[in-house]
Amino acid sequence: MNKKEIFQSVTSIEEQIAHLYKQLGELKSYLGELIEENHRLQVENDHLRRRLEQLSERKVEQGKKQTKAKLVDIGEGYDNLARLYQEGFHICNVHYGSLRTDGDCLFCLSFLNKK
């Protein structure tokens, strides 16, 4: 190998190193962007999880309140209507107070089964 070929080889290797260094810089920049995006997404994910937990807790509390309200709503009036129906009277808005002669009334039953 003569001096010219050695010099060309060194120049070629130097160009390759420069190209690889440029690629390494681009990869480093891209990696930094990915790390920043990952951190941002983790923060957002944590925020959304806390928000979801809060909403779930609210729904559970509302469900408990509604259950208590339903238990309070079904009280003496409902019992009186059920007793009247068992005694053979209509409790529906169509035939309220009249005597049931043909067995069960679907309107009355649907009214009693409302929750």
UniProtKB/Swiss-Prot annotation:
A Pfam family matched in the record: YabA
Source taxon at top rank: Bacteria
Cofactor note: Binds 1 zinc ion per subunit.
Subcellular location as annotated: Cytoplasm, Nucleoid
Binding positions (Zn(2+)): 90, 92, 105, 108
UniProt keywords, alphabetically: Cytoplasm, DNA replication, DNA replication inhibitor, Metal-binding, Zinc
Main location: cytoplasm
Protein family per UniProt: Belongs to the YabA family.
Known partners and oligomeric status: Homotetramer. Interacts with both DnaA and DnaN, acting as a bridge between these two proteins.
Protein name listed in UniProt: Replication initiation control protein YabA
Gene source species: Anoxybacillus flavithermus (strain DSM 21510 / WK1)
Name of the coding gene: yabA
